[in-house]
Amino acid sequence: MRDKTTREKALCYIVRDGQLLVFRHLDYSYEEVGIQVPAGTVKPGEDPRDAALREAREETGLTAFTVVRKLGVAHYDITPYRPEIQRRHFFQLALHQETPDRWTSEEDQDGIGKPIRFECFWIPLEHGHVLQSGQGALLGNLIDQ
């Protein structure tokens, strides 16, 4: 078995009126990527809080986010997808702009490669158990704290 690398990740729980902001990839099957919250890799030297705000903007196309609080850190082993342990920093974000119930956005990947297309939408917070790859692990902290 290959050695596993550890990667720092930032995940965003954006909640409004009891609804959680999620997305699906338009160019990949549901079976492959499921429903996700905005999340991504923390760049070298980047604060996880800043990474959370950046990922929320990049993946939703929205801009008016603020960090409410850090909810905690959890580790997730994504093997067999690839030999990697993700050290995930979970943040609750507030959104300060109106949105439709559903919209599409694109992440341009810093101009490298084809843009990634997303469909963003809101689901009831209590349906957060459907999130892909353990992304719902700290949803309970939204209520418990």
Show which residues each predicted segment covers:
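Nudix hydrolase/Nudix homology domain
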Residues: 30-35, 100-145
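Hydrophobic pocket-lining residues within nucleotide cofactor-binding pockets
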Residues: 42, 95, 125-128
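Active-site segment of metal-dependent pyrophosphate-handling enzymes
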Residues: 62-100, 105-108
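Short hydrophobic/aromatic beta-strand or adjacent loop that forms the aromatic wall/cage
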Residues: 7-11, 86-90, 117
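Short, well-ordered beta-strand micro-motif
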Residues: 14, 92-94, 121-124
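Short, solvent-exposed loop/turn segments at secondary-structure junctions
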Residues: 4, 30, 74-78
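Conserved N-terminal beta-strand and adjoining loop/helix that marks the start
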Residues: 1-21, 40-44
